[in-house]
């Protein structure tokens, strides 16, 4: 019986791992990221961009997949007031990359997702000759496991973002009450 349970657990882990994808990989199915998401963690090599009142402290509510673009619906908090912000990200020539104009020119990819629970995004912003990067961890639910959060932190470090520049927003005002 124990062997059967271990076998089932092993097969479950293999199936879960096999379902992970990257927007730059051949197995990525953009349709599966359609729907509701929650911002869990933001990270940046310019921390001030994601701190309170930072221009990139955006709380994702929804991704709507179109043929060659994504409609992204966010909320921002300014002076404790929630505001809605929508933008359209267009596919670029590079596989799995999207671009959007917001406080500069941005390109982003989705290095990891399992579609059902989490999505990890990597964004590069260019404005006035300066560049910074931002990474986001998003969940289908308002919070994620510590294991997924740790995997995200390691991915941030691989991109040169220090742990002190990773902000867990799962307990912050993310305008959850403003969701329809």
Curated annotation (Swiss-Prot):
Coiled coil: none annotated. GO terms for biological process: aerobic respiration; cellular response to lipid; energy reserve metabolic process; glucose homeostasis; heat generation; locomotor rhythm; mitochondrion organization; negative regulation of DNA-templated transcription. Disulfide bonds join 82-175. InterPro entries: Calycin (IPR012674), Lipocalin (IPR002345), Lipocalin_CS (IPR022272), Lipocln_cytosolic_FA-bd_dom (IPR000566), Maj_urinary (IPR002971). It is found in: Secreted. Residues 1-18 form the signal peptide. Belongs to the calycin superfamily. Lipocalin family. Binds pheromones that are released from drying urine of males. These pheromones affect the sexual behavior of females. This is Major urinary protein 2.
